[in-house]
């Protein structure tokens, strides 16, 4: 059984953190420069939420909403369901589907352990015969290269 801990071990350990008071425009630039769709929001070593492209687009659709005047705290998702490091990929998929989210923060007790995306879960489910480490290590997450080992 593939658990959250197993998926996190095989992902890059580098998470992209941002402070809740960071300006939204700067956060957008950071997302773009890193080619990421989310940033983990941390304050004094404590998980606060996730800043996502999806949440940003929803806020920007609000009439009169000005990104230049907003902080990450104004946009971040704080009520996402969470998984434990022992959660199975099936449990995590159920959480994502039932809560309409693409990201799950993962905790080891009360300690933030990382984020698992829908994409991470799909890779783990569709390609269980090869190491996720091989997949994540390939330049663009190349399925064919990872399958060939």
For each feature predicted by the language model, list its residue ranges.
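A glycine-centered beta-loop-beta connector
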Residues: 31-34, 39-55, 96, 104-120
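Extended aliphatic helical segments
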Residues: 18, 24, 40-41, 57, ...
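Short charge-dense sequence patches
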Residues: 1-13, 23-26, 40-47
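The conserved cystathionine-beta-synthase
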Residues: 17-35, 42, 82-100, 107, ...
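Tandem CBS (Bateman) regulatory domains
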Residues: 1-13, 52-82, 88-97, 117-149
């Amino acid at each position: 059984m593939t658990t959250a801990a197993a998926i996190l071990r095989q992902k890059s350990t580098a998470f992209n953190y941002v402070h809740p008071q960071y300006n939204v425009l700067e956060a957008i630039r950071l997302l773009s420069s890193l080619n990421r769709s989310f940033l983990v929001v941390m304050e004094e070593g404590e998980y606060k939420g996730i800043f996502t492209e999806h949440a940003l687009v929803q806020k920007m659709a609000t009439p009169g909403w000005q990104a230049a005047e907003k902080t990450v705290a104004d946009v971040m998702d704080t009520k996402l369901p969470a998984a434990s490091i022992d959660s199975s990929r099936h449990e995590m998929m159920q959480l994502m589907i039932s809560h309409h989210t693409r990201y799950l923060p993962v905790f080891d007790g009360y300690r933030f352990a990382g984020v698992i995306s829908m994409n991470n879960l799909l890779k783990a489910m569709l390609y269980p015969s090869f190491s996720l480490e091989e997949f994540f290590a390939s330049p663009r997450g190349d399925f064919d290269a990872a399958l060939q080992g």
